[in-house]
Amino acid sequence: MREAHQDAVARVSEERLWRRHMEMARIGAIPGHGVNRAALSQEDIAARKVLIGWARDRNFELGVDAIGNLFVRRPGHDAAAAPVMTGSHMDSQPRGGRFDGIYGVLAALEALQAINEAGVKTRRPIELVAWTNEEGGRFPPCTMGSAVHTGARRLEDFLDIKDNEGVALRDALAQTLAATPDLAQRPMKAPAAAYIEAHIEQGPLLENAGKTIGAVTGIQGLRWFNIEIFGKTDHAGTTPLALRQDALRDAVNIIKALHELTHDATDTVRFTVGRMLVTPNSTNSVASHVLFSVDVRHPDPVTIDRLGKAVEPAARKAAKQCTIMVTPTLHDDPCVFDPGVVDAVERAANELKLRSMRLPSGASHDAMYMARICPSGMIFVPCEKGVSHNEAENAKSADLAAGARVLTAALLEFANK
């Protein structure tokens, strides 16, 4: 590692990085040290304004694209060169933690600031991006901002999606963009030389192995569905079971069938029903309508394709009393990260004498869409007991700083190519 690069890495401040995490954690704070910072909400807008303020204090350039992805740019001496990009997301799950997503944004800002303080000149610009609606908790599906920015999906396909309160994404997006009207407009699918995203692991592998850094090799594939069941409302006390069209009973039958479909002795398949809406949702009424989500994941492309195709037939076979509708909402194939980026992360960890290992990501991340347009990869750091999407999510400040140092070194390597 060059001496100037070593100086930049050394300037990464564990205290400053932690302090910024704690400041962001106050925006949308909920009991139990958790965070509820939904995409395109007032809390999201507040977090964006804090990040913009920190960037402006350091004279970084700012921009935003049509879906609200926020860009912070440190120029390079070759203005025509494609940037090296880094970042993650600032939105959270409804009962999320203080580090998921926001760590990648703040580690990126820390890297840019450390490079600035060291006075390092880079050929390429380095850009931080805070992606819009990675979680998909308010407006499904997930990883929306990166999917639209890279051209994998069209913004128009998402604008009419509504949250549980009936608010359309187009209106929430317009409100968010109006809150920062002075930002420069960025085009979609702008060229990038590389993309490196830092993130907490959201699993227990690093902690259990006693490693500080994960060089992520790829992301498993997933299929999302909405399953709707149409029955008939009746009185719970007077309607014989044999005469009911009980939507909730069929929902239970379908979920049981899908659990059986996805059973895997190796515990590699991931199957989740995480959201359910019941109508009329009354104790003494038979349910007339149920809507629930299905999330299936696997790292092997053949297996995830087979499971995805089997969801609807299994659901229809399991429904005994009602009619159903199965709607695919997300289709992501497994992603393999660029070997050069994986090597650079591992090399930086070794040079900094940090214990590292290679591992795949079980969760989806924006890096999987960036991998479609440029060499991409990720850096994982441990989170306590692997807990994430939970108020109890926690990470050590030393591990967060270690990941930011590896990120700084890797960014500098690509920024001078």
Which ranges hold each PLM region?
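His/Asp/Glu-rich mid-to-C-terminal helical/loop segments that flank catalytic regions of hydrolases
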Residues: I219, H235, T239-A265, V311, ...
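A non-catalytic alpha/beta surface segment that caps or lines the substrate-entry region
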Residues: A29-P75
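N-terminal capping segment at the start of a domain
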Residues: R2-S41, F158, P328, D332
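Midchain, well-structured core segments that form catalytic/ion-binding scaffolds
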Residues: E134, P140-P301
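Zn-dependent metallopeptidase/amidohydrolase metal-coordination segment
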Residues: L17-I30, G87-S88, R355-V406, L411-F414
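A short beta-alpha structural unit
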Residues: A39, T272-N281, S293-D300, T323-V342, ...
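Alpha-helical metal-binding/catalytic segments enriched in His/Glu/Asp
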Residues: T86, R95-E135, R223-I229, T238-L261, ...
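Catalytic-core environment of secreted peptidases
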Residues: R58, L70-Y103, A108
